[in-house]
Amino acid sequence: MGRRSTSSTKSGKFMNPTDQARKEARKRELKKNKKQRMMVRAAVLKMKDPKQIIRDMEKLDEMEFNPVQQPQLNEKVLKDKRKKLRETFERILRLYEKENPDIYKELRKLEVEYEQKRAQLSQYFDAVKNAQHVEVESIPLPDMPHAPSNILIQDIPLPGAQPPSILKKTSAYGPPTRAVSILPLLGHGVPRLPPGRKPPGPPPGPPPPQVVQMYGRKVGFALDLPPRRRDEDMLYSPELAQRGHDDDVSSTSEDDGYPEDMDQDKHDDSTDDSDTDKSDGESDGDEFVHRDNGERDNNEEKKSGLSVRFADMPGKSRKKKKNMKELTPLQAMMLRMAGQEIPEEGREVEEFSEDDDEDDSDDSEAEKQSQKQHKEESHSDGTSTASSQQQAPPQSVPPSQIQAPPMPGPPPLGPPPAPPLRPPGPPTGLPPGPPPGAPPFLRPPGMPGLRGPLPRLLPPGPPPGRPPGPPPGPPPGLPPGPPPRGPPPRLPPPAPPGIPPPRPGMMRPPLVPPLGPAPPGLFPPAPLPNPGVLSAPPNLIQRPKADDTSAATIEKKATATISAKPQITNPKAEITRFVPTALRVRRENKGATAAPQRKSEDDSAVPLAKAAPKSGPSVPVSVQTKDDVYEAFMKEMEGLL
């Protein structure tokens, strides 16, 4: 900090002599009082209590790091207060560091303790705030200990305590058989509960298969084993074929609990089959076999111990034929509309019905005979069913396309689900057999070609029987009928399927004429106004041919729309403005030139004044007069030169 001159201010401005004298006097006074001021500052610091300063800072910290209550003061205010208190405490430390080192050491200890407390408060505050933002599900839990705990496990068998059972699993549908075999041993070998203690309650969920097995033994009823799963048992463990379902075998045998376990699954499957007969026949096709023939087959197998049957196809085919009778074409169609796969048997039924449709045979007994023949083939040969099932899908494509059109028609609610499925259908369904499939919508009412056979071939009736009704109401038939009808089917698709029903009743009376030839009926009105609009250009083009008529027409239209009179205030001056000055000056001398000018004035005044926008007819007249004037002007110039 350099010395400043007393003759100028800080900015360098010259000072008055009086101000210069005052500044010099103050400088001397400050130099004299510097020691005194330092002593005053030290005395003020000594008057302040460092412990009180620490307590004030602790209060600020508690206020700031309080997780329960928001601080009363603003964050910025808290920082400023702490900063001032901290600076004061540091000045006191520096003062006592020079004057009294002992007090300095004590103050240093207070500062360290304060810092530790502040760190603890900050850590606790952060932990609480973080815990509020963390979700309970995101907290990782510790792994379960692998070693068994000290809890007494008396009669509850642990599945994890029998690792060998994993290797002896005979089927994926049942629990390990080894676990079942160890169950009685656990009951005898494990010590019982003390007399004063009660066993724990059953675990949540359905009873385990072991309990079902024990209950079956006590009550005395025997559950049946499905034949298909019995075949699996024979494949995996031949001992079961020899022993069968003998309950006298010791409890350690591997087949002791397996039949009951599988029986429970069988009952579940039977209940499931009752539901899936209507919805998903493909996935549970095998379970259809076991529902009716289960008791019969199991009773026979109980009587004969050796009942290894690797080819149990007749039973399956019998049940499948039963299923074929149960699954009607209506159900197959509903399954197809629901987006589910149709069981192969249902498709075969459709195949038979379609063959009869194509032959147009009104005899329903032919269908029964064909089904009986199919039954006999399936009974005689097990592989015939597999081959027929493999051949059914390719042949069942036309039925889905041919039987589909009747569906949209029957109920008013039918069309909504039908359009999304039908658009791809008609093009593929019409080529193979237009007579059987499309006729309900395409044939006139006088051709009941298929309406007789359809109700008889398809027992349910309503879906196939309704097609005779739709022809009077075209909306249901519009989606599948674009190729034959042409224009009419293209109009409905933009509208939603629910709109067509009101058309016949409400909109038909006024719209009957245009609906038949829709495009020809709609377009003729448009050409009628067009000739009136397009007739103007020919008239305009023809107008220049007749100057008088064109001028008259232009004047009439111009007066109606645009008035060009204000454009020419002085006709003579405006017309002769572009004429050379020589012509204007010497106009009285040259009578020949004046006459054409007057003529041009008279001729061009009318078109310029009244028909300025349409200058077509007036152009030739003005051009001719100007040419005459120009020729006269050139002659005059030649005479002058």
Curated annotation (Swiss-Prot):
GO terms for biological process: mRNA processing; RNA splicing; rRNA processing. Residues 1-45 are annotated as: Required for nuclear import. It is found in: Nucleus; Cytoplasm. Keywords: Acetylation, Coiled coil, Cytoplasm, Disease variant, Isopeptide bond, Methylation, mRNA processing, mRNA splicing, Nucleus, Phosphoprotein, rRNA processing, Ubl conjugation. Residues 1-11 have a biased composition (Polar residues). Residues 28-37 have a biased composition (Basic residues). Activates pre-mRNA splicing. May inhibit PP1 phosphatase activity. The modification Phosphoserine is found at residues 181, 237, 279, 283, 353, 361, 364, 600. GO terms for cellular component: cytosol; intracellular membrane-bounded organelle; nucleoplasm; nucleus. The modification Omega-N-methylarginine is found at residue 192. A motif (PGR) lies at residues 455-466. This is WW domain-binding protein 11. It comes from Homo sapiens. Changing residue 198 to A: Loss of PQBP1-binding. InterPro entries: WW_dom-bd_prot_11 (IPR019007). Residues 75-133 form a coiled coil. The keyword Methyltransferase does not apply. The modification Phosphotyrosine is found at residue 236. Residues 192-210, 405-447, 456-504, 510-530 have a biased composition (Pro residues). Residues 1-37, 186-213, 236-552, 587-623 are annotated as: Disordered. The modification N6-acetyllysine is found at residues 13, 565.
